[in-house]
Amino acid sequence: MLAESELGTKLCFKHSLRPKNSDNYQSQFTHHLEAYEAFPDLTGYAVSKPLFLDKEQQISIFEFANGQNLRDYLSYDCPSQKSQLVVLETAGRWLDHYHRARTTEFHTFNPRWAVNHYCQIRNRIETGKLGVPAPGLFLKGVSKIEEEAANLKGLETVACIQHGDFHMGNLIWDGKVVTGIDISTGHLAPVGHDVNKFLVDYVRRFRPASALSTGQVLPPDVREAFFSGYTLVSPEDPTVRLFSHAQLLELWMKIPKRKKDRTRAKQLCLQQIKPIAKKAFTKSG
């Protein structure tokens, strides 16, 4: 909800009715506040300013970020592929500033946790304990993660403080300033999580599967554009490579198995990711 203060400042009111978890609501507000305080003072890049929290009522107030979220901007006002790539570079630069603003740690990548996680999911699907749409294709994705992980173990990666929900709806663009909103976590994790949540969100909405190379989730020009702005790691970072496939599976698991149980948005998401999966989950070589 939009309002205006006595001083003329535009305000954004947020009220969360469900789930009722005041401690979690406060925690998310605190993470956003910490991100705002740490973010560098830069021309053209910002984090929305938190102003007020009522923990028990689950109400918060932020300074309003002018503009459109990138999902809407690219859908309605930036339809050409060339202009979208410029926006992707800008988004990459915002995330680069965000990740560098606080703790960064270099690590040797061990994909064992990710592989074990998805192997457990595969076991639940095969034993009937978990239902997903198009399970055969989903399981090819698990096999692809196993294949990729074997080639990525031992490579260097970077962990940093995550955004937590870095999709296209959480960057606001007014033509001059790109502003991050809805920051929800404060823990260290590999950079590939934030990077792929954003890029897979873009690819599924705006790129046909024909643009992909076999075995890949992200088209080459998308990688080049984003990583022209995001320079903390290269597109060859092991978590960027592995978690692109994992992000497809994470989206997939949120979609009900039965079509009649899906919202229109969930059905659309499935229609978007299946063609990508058919190309991306093909074995390399």
Model-derived features: positions:
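Short pocket-lining segment of the protein kinase catalytic domain that shapes the ATP-binding cleft
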Residues: 60-69
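Conserved kinase catalytic-core helix
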Residues: 68-111
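Short beta-strand micro-motifs within the conserved protein kinase catalytic domain, predominantly
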Residues: 47-58
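Active-site activation/catalytic loop segments of kinase-like enzymes and analogous catalytic loops
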Residues: 193-234, 245-264
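ATP-binding glycine-rich loop module of kinase domains
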Residues: 2-27
